[in-house]
Amino acid sequence: TDISNVDDNNILLNVDEGALNNLSFGYGLSYDTRKTGLNASGGVLLRFDQDFSGLAGDIDATRTAVLALAEKTILNDSISLRIIGEGGIYDRTNGNSRLTERFFARGKLRGFESNGIGPRDKNVLKDALGGNYFASVRMETDFPVGLPEEYGITGGAFYDMGSVWGLDKTIGAGSDNIVDDSFNLRSAAGVSLFWSTPIGPLRFNWSRAFEKQSYDRVQNFD
């Protein structure tokens, strides 16, 4: 991995700058009853992934990620209910974790930008730093909105919560730029519009963040 062209004002990312060699291997386990289970109105998905670095190269670390999903339809399959939980741990044993190795909240928390939560440098650019840990829970429902079925338009609602946290280094040498890397819960809720079109399904989300930090970057529509 190579981190380059880092702004001089970003002391924490300057520490990460440079190239490292890495050789890793991993495995994944999954259990999915959504298509094959006896209960046609619901199912679960369980997934466990783990990667190991250290056989060769400059990085000695373990990356673990888990996902659990449960879904069910009710009222003659007209309404669907779904809950998704995710979590991850990155444990590096030979030095500090780097930007390219950490977790970010991309796609895991609606109501915020892709890198909108988690530890953030306090410099001019306010760069997202990622975290060694992440956890999220997303709850959502899909339902008809009263339009004819041929329109292909349905509605939804959701509530998300989670966090990205944990750095091995929270301050650069000789700097008072201390980063908040503690666990701070974020949450957001909103509504969705689903539209089945000839070019594929479209989804529009309107959301509002309820729990957030002053340095987070929210996103009310996507």
Q: What does each model-identified segment do?
A:
Residues 173-177, 182-197:
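Strand-loop-strand
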